[in-house]
Amino acid sequence: MREKQQGTTGAGGMSSGAAAASPGQRHASIVEMLSTPPPAIVVQTGMEDENVRATGGETAADGDERRTLSRQSSTSSTESHASATSCLTKVHAQKWQHIELSQLVEENKLVFINAEMSVEEAFNTLVEHNLTSLPVERYPGDMDCVTFDYNDLNSYLLLVLGKTTVADEEITRQCQSGQPVPVGRIVKLTPKNPFYKVPETEDLSTVMGILGSGVHRVAIVDSTSSSIRGILSQRRLMKYLWDNARQFSNLEVLLNSSLQKLGIGVLDPHTPPTSRQSRVISILDTEPLLVALHKMHTERISSIAVIDHQGMLLGNISVTDVKQVTRTSQYPLLHNTCRHFISVILNNRGLEMGKDSFPIFHVYPTSSLARTVAKLVATKAHRLWIVQPVEQGVLVSPPVAPTTIDGSSEFSSRHVSPSPAPSPAGSHGPLTTSASPLGTLDKEYSTGKLIGVVSLTDILGLLARKHTENKLVDPLSARRQRGSVAR
């Protein structure tokens, strides 16, 4: 479950083959570089380099000889230098629907945690291994394990702060008195989808039907022993299809079609979502960060759009950002505005990356599916916000300025330089300031009025309906199963 979740601003990434521009030179837009699938690369059989395997692999922990599908698939990984160079380059002759899951499994080691481990230790394990979710075992070899992720950490934080309540009075008392709480008890507080297990002899068509319904990941198991061989996440499947899109000619028509034509994404925030659309959930930039975290908790979502009073998209806050407020010294951020939090994160990311960064987590109704998938893959995001382009001459709110921890802001005249550089495992430490990653914006980086959202689930559901026998796949079924918290 190494699925990298969307960050606060979904910073863009530059392709590895793109040369860095000089400070005074306009940088090429990421979508100009990534709107078409990577060129086909013929890989010789027998090569040992993990970067040329069908799905890259990474040793996550010693002592566990289980296997995983990819660097990002066993436990939802955050940004890493290794993943920036992990390209899925294996060429397949058959249609993608018929590829057996066994062909994608690569030997690796999974990271599991015991249900008796404290929430604090579980969080430290996430950070130590640069992950965003971990399987929680009640006993070694537990086949019905659930996962601990940042949604659980968010629920725990809200419980500690007294912003939510649960029926278990003992857990409430332990949380609010600072006592260690077993992670196995916390994960039970957040509704989960079933732990789906798919035999490795099944093909991608089967998995597409499951992931296209909104399930975030499935376990790939040995067909004889039923032991887990790996975990396939929505994003890793999307990356696999994108990186090999030139080999799958039946994807061409869909990739060249616009979101509007395909009918995916909510294109009107006032229109109720259908069975094939996701809801647009946003928060005003003037609201406290704590309200945003609570809203993500109640709505069972992993990210939320930040807008101004005119409905203009300003930024994005992800549930993974809760790691930025786990220390007592960071608690003041909880009561400051969402706009302030976004600016602080931009500064922090700029310092960690060593380069300027700017969010490109939006697309337009007229954007092609290819451009949308390219941005999802490049930003490691789960969803992109659909905006209506700003008409010339229309005044809109200025973009969020990177802000220091004390609230001061600074702007730079430099041009934007999207970067795929990773966020280090220690990114949950104190937030610091850096030079502003915002500067003169060209049309590609301007946003607009929030009118919709398109997610990995929407796209995988579309592929399932168009190219598999799963014609009735409902992208919202898994979310309805998880439910929302009564307010």
Swiss-Prot record:
Location of the region described as Disordered in the Swiss-Prot/TrEMBL record: 1-39, 56-84, 406-439
The UniProt record lists the keyword Repeat: yes
Record InterPro entries: AMPK_gamma/SDS23_families, CBS_dom, CBS_dom_sf, Ssd23
A cellular component term, taken from the record's GO annotations: nucleus
Biased amino acid composition, Low complexity: 70-84, 414-430
Domain CBS intervals: 105-165, 189-248, 274-333, 396-469
UniProt entry keywords in alphabetical sequence: CBS domain, Cytoplasm, Nucleus, Repeat
Highest taxon of source: Eukaryota
Record Pfam families: CBS (PF00571)
Entry annotated with the keyword Cell membrane: no
Location in the cell: Cytoplasm; Nucleus
Molecular function GO labels: protein serine/threonine phosphatase inhibitor activity
One annotated GO biological process: cellular response to glucose starvation
Function description: Involved in DNA replication and cell separation.
Family classification: Belongs to the SDS23 family.
Protein name in UniProt: Protein SDS23
